[in-house]
Design a protein with these regions (language model features):
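Helical hairpin unit composed of two closely spaced alpha helices linked by a short loop
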Residues: 268, 277-323
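Hydrophobic alpha-helical transmembrane segments of multipass membrane transporters and ion channels
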Residues: 165, 185, 217-222, 255, ...
Length: 377
């Protein structure tokens, strides 16, 4: 009997190892293929083999009065696809040191180029942008490898949930283009995302049900708070300058960002409290409701400050590229705070309130679901 169990267990381990070895081999093949997939593109791709860079002059920005240096690059690149494969071309590229509207290129960069052809001869070439697919594939492969090494099957399920979220996001974009409210689409997709992610990772059980209900309630309250803040303040104190080029209403995008940005933190809080209280009840079903509530509050206190900071940096990270560009081009800190930080702070504060409310809801829902499991006789 023991030998039979041992063989079954050994066979299961062997199958698991074979599965992960096959997965890693597929990822490796994918990386190698992406590094050599230029033949798949219709656009001309070239690899930079040499650069000669020259300083031209300093120029003054008329808007802010700051100076920036201008450089010219004489680039030699070898074409990697199309009928002109293996031809060496020369490209001139001018860029500003601030790199707001221009780009500096480096040796070994792969770029898309447009060619000016006259009588089957290349007269001139112009760089259109980077070829970035290899970086995406390498990062994705690295992410899958690390998440499966650390999380095993749950790590793989987490990655599947990420794919599901990307799919939901594309659905939101598609139906929003058809005229459906962005707020409604974001809210519904957030609820679906929450349900799918938690069920995939934690299975369908009481703690998952508790976390799903708590997350949905937390998201609903967060969305309502966002709507109330916008309508009461009448947009006073909220600067939407960074959204001025958008063709969609600012309100919908702002609230959708809060819903999507707060989803991860709210889910994390909900499953943390639900799992922790579940563990406490399983270890000691004699615990009183008062002690259980106190334990839930203590857990909430431990994670609240961390999650609010995570939420703040989640929102602020979207503005970092613009902040860096503006700093490099001499724009004052006060202007940056007015244009960017105030909006991100509003998002973080609303999200923080949502997190705090989710803690209370999670404790209440978990106790309600596990009430029968408590033995107070």
């Amino acid at each position: 009997m023991n030998n039979g169990c041992y063989l079954v267990k050994k066979n299961k381990i062997t199958k698991t190892k074979f599965f992960y070895a096959t997965l890693y081999l597929i990822l490796l093949i994918g990386i190698v293929f992406t590094l050599n997939n230029s033949f798949l593109y219709k656009k001309t791709i070239a690899k930079i083999i040499a650069i000669d860079e020259t300083y031209i002059k300093d120029t003054e920005d008329g808007n802010y009065g700051c100076k920036t240096a201008i450089y010219e690059q004489n680039i030699k690149a070898i074409i990697k696809n199309t009928q002109y494969k293996d031809r060496v071309i020369t490209i001139k590229n001018t860029y500003h040191k601030g790199e707001v509207y221009t780009q500096r290129y480096h040796k070994n960069d792969e770029v898309f180029v447009s060619l000016n052809i006259t009588k089957d001869d290349i007269k001139k070439a112009h760089i259109e942008g980077y070829k970035r697919d290899k970086y995406i594939v390498i990062l994705t492969s690295l992410f899958i490898i690390i998440i499966t090494i650390i999380g095993k099957s749950k790590g793989l399920l987490s990655f599947i949930s990420v794919i599901a979220n990307i799919f939901l996001f594309n659905i939101v974009i598609y139906f929003n283009a058809k005229g459906i409210s962005l707020i409604l689409l974001s809210f519904v997709s957030a609820l679906l995302s929450c349900t799918i992610c938690l069920t995939l990772v934690s299975g369908f059980n009481k703690k998952t049900i508790s976390a799903i209900i708590s997350s949905c309630c937390g998201l609903t309250i967060t969305m309502l708070i966002s709507l109330i803040v916008i309508h009461i303040s009448n947009y006073n104190g909220l600067r939407f300058d960074q959204m001025e080029l958008l063709t969609r209403p600012y309100e919908g995008i702002f609230i959708s960002e809060i819903i999507m940005g707060g989803l991860g933190a709210i889910m994390d809080i909900a499953i943390t409290i639900s799992s922790s209280l579940n563990e406490i009840i399983e270890k000691n079903n004699q615990i009183t409701l008062k002690e259980l509530i106190t334990s839930g509050k203590n857990i909430g206190r431990d994670v609240t400050s961390t999650m609010i900071n995570v939420l703040f940096f989640t929102y602020i990270c979207g503005a970092i590229p613009n902040l860096v560009l503006y700093f490099k081009n001499g724009i004052s800190i006060s202007s940056l705070i007015n244009e960017f930080i105030s909006l991100e702070m509003a998002r973080a504060l609303i999200g923080g309130i949502g997190i705090c409310i989710t803690i209370i809801i999670s404790i209440f829902i978990t106790i309600l679901l596990y009430k029968r499991s408590l033995n107070h006789e």
